[in-house]
Amino acid sequence: MPRVRDPKRTRRKVLEASYREFYRHGFQGGSINRIVTAAGITKGALFHHFAGKNELGYAVLDEFLTPAVNNWWVEPLHDAGDPVQVLRNILKRFLKRIEEEDPQAGFLFNGCPICNFAVEMSPLDEGFRERLGTIYDTWHCAISEALERGQATAVVRSDINPTAEASFLVSIMAGSASVGKVTQQMAFFRNCIKVAQIHVESLVPS
């Protein structure tokens, strides 16, 4: 019986394998040969869906990492009645994920996939830089707009600058992921999250 072709499933397999490959080896170090082997397809099947490696990288950003930011930050903060409580929950959830995931496959050894792409590819390719800029802007706006709404309802201090606070939180999360993959020590992540948690608590009116 001939095998039924499923283009959507094939494309998804390629993206999943590409995400893992780029996360572990970087975009430039990522191997098309390893991707097709991991996906169980031919190079012809891969290039049927993606014109080249850059297009594949763009798709990973658009279809994997953008939704991840939406899931972790944008959706929880959207119309949040108490943004400080939501930020508490996000930080707690993030630390729990790092503690429970396989270290060699996750943040502890590999860092943040968005940060990895940003550091490696933003200086080299405008398509990557623009997409990454959009991701960071979305992340930043989700925090700053939530804090502004919190100020309007007096659950966030009126004397803080939501834009600056969002910049700080994005920076500490991104920075901890980047430095953390060098230290490869759980204690480092715990310390960074603890500092972020202390700072979040300082946003509550006294």
Predicted stretch roles:
Residues 2, 13, 17, 21-63:
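Helix-turn-helix
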Residues 59, 74-110, 162-169:
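Hydrophobic alpha-helical connector segments
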Residues 15, 61-65, 129-140, 166:
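Amphipathic, non-transmembrane alpha-helical scaffold segments
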Residues 89-144:
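Short secondary-structure transition hinges
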Residues 120, 175-178:
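Structural signal for membrane-spanning alpha-helices in multi-pass inner-membrane proteins
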Residues 1, 89-101, 137-155, 163, ...:
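C-terminal peripheral helix-coil segments that are non-catalytic and often amphipathic
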Residues 51-55, 59, 78-81, 122-126, ...:
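Residues in soluble alpha-helical coiled-coils and helical-bundle/repeat scaffolds
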